[in-house]
Amino acid sequence: MSSFDQTMQFHFPEEPAETNVREVLLTVYDALQEKGYNPINQIVGYLLSGDPAYIPRHKDARTLIRKIERDELIEELVKFYLQGQRKG
């Protein structure tokens, strides 16, 4: 059986986050909204492309979001979404 036929597992190291992902995302969201952008579109653009130009410097949002790996941001968003779906 080739390696393409097997499911790969992705493991995140269980270590405390230096930067609170939720706080960063909320700060970035607020900064985008204050500048008149659609926050969801801009954050998705950043997550898909990795291009920090989607995030403004306002409120230091660009610097904050770049301190967190994109895969960590996506992991937190997926966890939050799925936990909300299970409760609702």
UniProtKB/Swiss-Prot annotation:
Coiled coil: none annotated. Transmembrane segments: none annotated. Pfam families: IreB (PF06135). Belongs to the UPF0297 family. HAMAP family: UPF0297. This is UPF0297 protein GTNG_2488.
